[in-house]
Amino acid sequence: MLRKLLIGTALATSFAFSAHAADVKEVQMLHWWTSGGEAAALNVLKGDLAKEGFAWKDVPVAGGGGDAAMTALKAMVAAGNYPTASQMLGYTVLDYAAAGVMGDLTETAKKEGWDKSVPAALQKFSVYEGKWVAAPVNVHSVNWLWINKAVMDKIGGTEPKTFDDFVALLDKAKAAGVIPLALGGQNWQEATMFDSVVLSTGGPEFYKKAFNDLDDASLKSDTMKKSFDNLAKLVTYVDPNFSGRDWNLATAMVIKGDALVQVMGDWAKGEFHAAKKTPGTDFLCYRFPGTDGSVIYNSDMFGMFNVPDDRKAAQVALATATLSKSFQSAFNVVKGSVPARTDVPDTDFDACGKKGIADLKKANEGGTLFGSLAQGYGAPPAVANAYKDVVSKFVHGQIKTSDEAVTELVKAIDDAK
């Protein structure tokens, strides 16, 4: 569908560049990094490019899941108004590449050795038909708990190793009058948490079969029903005002001690960093119970568009800066993620960052590095959107039982394929 829309409009507007063109010394970037921690991380890149003489033009679109930004991007591209680059996730990069609107960074990639330094799991989404079309910025993982240490100490809690341990910990917080679980009631947040629940409930092989291979038997299984039951249990620990809450506001609840824990990707750590909080002293980072040894990942990519020749120098400068070792370290320290290349030392990273880097290496080597279905790395966008919709309806009571949820999930994914 995207290919049909964009090919037609790209042909119709192939001469529209001059009317919409950015300044040749300007990097025009569409993104959804609008929270405090995200903006601070992006400033690292802006500063690096400024040193090279390139101005930065933001096209920010708020919304942590990126849905609104992708709607804006589709409109821009359909109008022939290509940005220098856009923040994108996994399969979306491949969709735009298939539509023929992406640039070609292969010469830059060869010159700078990206083939050797960028993990194969990321190259699957940044290389299309042998051409580099995107620059990976980071690797995030979603199966994390972010815990307020003062609240944890107050209730006498310890790291939960199993799902039952986690429920017992949430019960302690509830008994102490603290909101146990901070959640934003948006479909991508709910589905991101469910990614971790499914991995915890079914184990690594089950997660891969269900959410990466889209195996019908796994999606229909009793294990999936149990996963929905476990999700329903977690939702009982959420405050009644969660619906529509932005993810960073849920993180702020933990930072302030209004809530004990948030289940969220490691971009949440950027908010703790922005609030001048220190791991081990102010907050704790644990893997979601039952998922240690596995990593559910996503990666922010800068998809590079087929801009006119006079704008390509700015694009190459952006790509080069993005995958430089110095930027990969400085940016990911602030963002909460880990580098998108394997040869960046962990020297400047805090305890959570060091754990993230070590976990990623272990999972990559052990075959337990899995794409997040909620975050656009498990399956194409139509499937991911169908998944998020079903999970959200279950969380908000529109789907009543786990049996019904499994039936709806199987149907939605089949229809989206």
Curated annotation (Swiss-Prot):
Pfam families: SBP_bac_1. It is found in: Periplasm. Its main location: periplasm. GO terms for cellular component: periplasmic space. Keywords: Periplasm, Signal, Sugar transport, Transport. Residues 1-21 form the signal peptide. It comes from Mesorhizobium japonicum (strain LMG 29417 / CECT 9101 / MAFF 303099) (Mesorhizobium loti (strain MAFF 303099)). Part of a binding-protein-dependent transport system for a sugar. InterPro entries: Bact_solute-bd_prot1, SBP. It comes from the Bacteria. PANTHER family: ARABINOSE-BINDING PROTEIN-RELATED, BINDING PROTEIN COMPONENT OF ABC SUGAR TRANSPORTER-RELATED. Belongs to the bacterial solute-binding protein 1 family. This is Probable sugar-binding periplasmic protein.
